[in-house]
Amino acid sequence: KRSEPNRTPSDVAIMVSEAVELAEIELRRRNVRLSHYVAARLPKLLVDPILIEQVLVNLMKNAAESIDHAKRATARRSVELRVIPRQLDGQSVVEFSVMDSGQGLAPEVMERLYEAFFSTKAEGMGIGLNLCRTIVESHQGRMQAENIYNGLDVIGCRFSFWIPLSDATNSIVTPNSSGAGVSA
């Protein structure tokens, strides 16, 4: 039986900055610029922060590898991480997306993206995205990948995943009967 994530109310900005710090070494080594944007005042997420950081690091490293593989010129070697609140089918979620300026995903790769042990890389075990998706889904989230187009040309790729705001996270501070705030 797979162990459940060790969930705690977690600050999104802290998770992102820790993931960025971990991924930045690899990105610098590949001469890839990283920019990131985290929306202000995001609520805490009830997640296992280590696991979510692991997903973010994996996506950023994959993005850098894709750019390297595409042999992009220095000016076009960038990865962008964006974290924003969204409404999806009436559900409040926080969406994390990693965009790269690599060569995108071929249709046959797109189909097999999350298969265990499927990899387009010479090195690597092919457990990365499969594990990422498992982690996201264990948090009741979803993950998706899409190519980014400029006209008919693929100019990169976007991997995104979202994590729902649970009722517990929305009520971290709830007024008790006296009207004073209580921390859950």
Residue positions per predicted region:
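Glycine-rich ATP-binding loops of the HATPase_c
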Residues: 140-150
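Conserved micro-motifs of the catalytic ATP-binding
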Residues: 1-5, 44-47, 120
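A conserved beta-strand-to-alpha-helix junction within the catalytic ATP-binding
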Residues: 8-20
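Short conserved segment of the HATPase_c
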Residues: 105-117
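A residue-level detector for a conserved hydrophobic packing site
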Residues: 52-53
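Detector for a conserved hydrophobic position within an alpha-helical segment of the HATPase_c
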Residues: 136-137
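ATP-lid-like helix-loop hinge signature
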Residues: 64-92, 148-153
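Conserved catalytic submotifs in the C-terminal HATPase_c
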Residues: 28, 33-43
